[in-house]
């Protein structure tokens, strides 16, 4: 496990204990960076038109298409720190 993998794992745990809930924009960004960092480019069909939450998540992840998993992990770690993470 690399140093970045350890930081990414720590950030995932830390995000669950943030004292203030991130706003919707930051939540979508966290979701997209997590998915890109753990799975890579978006896979599977886009959710249906009336699945607003699923569509928003899919589109946020889709915007990161082509971003390396390592870069997404680093951005995730930095965002969690910005939101008050202390790991």
List PLM regions with ranges.
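A charge-rich, low-complexity, intrinsically flexible signal that marks solvent-exposed coils, linkers
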Residues: 1-87
């Amino acid at each position: 496990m690399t140093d970045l993998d350890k930081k990414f794992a720590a950030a995932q745990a830390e995000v669950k204990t943030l004292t203030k809930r991130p706003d919707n924009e930051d939540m979508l960004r966290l979701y997209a960076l997590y998915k890109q960092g753990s799975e890579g480019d978006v896979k599977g069909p886009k959710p249906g038109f009336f699945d607003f939450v699923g569509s928003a998540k899919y589109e946020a992840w889709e915007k990161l298409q082509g971003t390396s998993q390592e870069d997404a992990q680093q951005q995730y770690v930095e965002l969690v720190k910005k939101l008050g993470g202390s790991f």
